[in-house]
Regions:
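Amphipathic alpha-helical surface "interface" segments used
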Residues: 65-73, 155-170
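Metal-dependent peptidase/peptidase-like ectodomains
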Residues: 1-98, 103-110
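Generic secondary-structure transition motif, activating predominantly at the C-termini of alpha-helices
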Residues: 7, 49, 53, 118, ...
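His/Asp/Glu-rich mid-to-C-terminal helical/loop segments that flank catalytic regions of hydrolases
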Residues: 87-163
Length: 173
């Protein structure tokens, strides 16, 4: 809905960062990127993750089309460079238990709670992983906010042409 009636014009919107489904399983050695190869924001994510001692892991099943089904997609279609991270998109490498524990957390969540009545806050969650991910976004947002940089779509992205059409508007800034 926002992309159809934005408060600020999409051509002057720097970026969209989306964290879909909080990591409630504890701190992780990685962050899972959905839609690898789409925008320069991935470079920002890699730098911020490295500063935390983490790596970026691409989603394990891109054929599921999560990039095209998540909340940010209307902004991407409007040309705004987007970044989507989602630990349940595969491969969560948890500090306590590694990938095996991460895979089990994903199986349990998807199989038992995702979009069901138990898909609500739980006092047993370990939100340290969610805090890690939010800190990644804070660093990226602060960097973008303190610069005059406009992240771009990568060559080959189907959204690049839309953003390129409005490049002149951003040069005026």
């Amino acid at each position: 809905a926002y992309a159809k009636d934005p408060v600020y014009p999409l051509e002057k919107t720097v970026a969209n960062l989306t964290l879909d489904i909080l990591n409630t399983a504890g701190p992780a050695r990685d962050v899972v990127l959905v839609g690898e190869g789409q925008s320069e924001l991935e470079d920002d994510l890699a730098r911020a993750a490295a500063a935390q001692g983490r790596s970026v892991t691409p989603e394990t099943l891109p054929e599921n089309g999560l990039f095209y089904r998540a909340d940010h997609f209307s902004l991407a279609r409007g040309g705004v460079p987007v970044l989507l991270i989602m630990q349940i998109a595969g491969g969560a490498d948890l500090v306590d238990g590694g990938r095996e524990a991460g895979d089990q957390w994903i199986r349990d969540y998807i199989g038992n709670c995702y979009h069901q009545t138990c898909d609500a806050w739980n006092a047993d969650w370990d939100l340290r992983g969610a805090v890690q991910d939010m800190e990644l976004f804070r660093v990226i947002i602060e960097d973008l906010g303190n610069s005059r940089r406009w992240p771009q779509w990568r060559a080959g992205s189907e959204f690049k042409a839309i953003r390129d059409q409005s490049a002149e508007v951003r040069r005026e800034e």
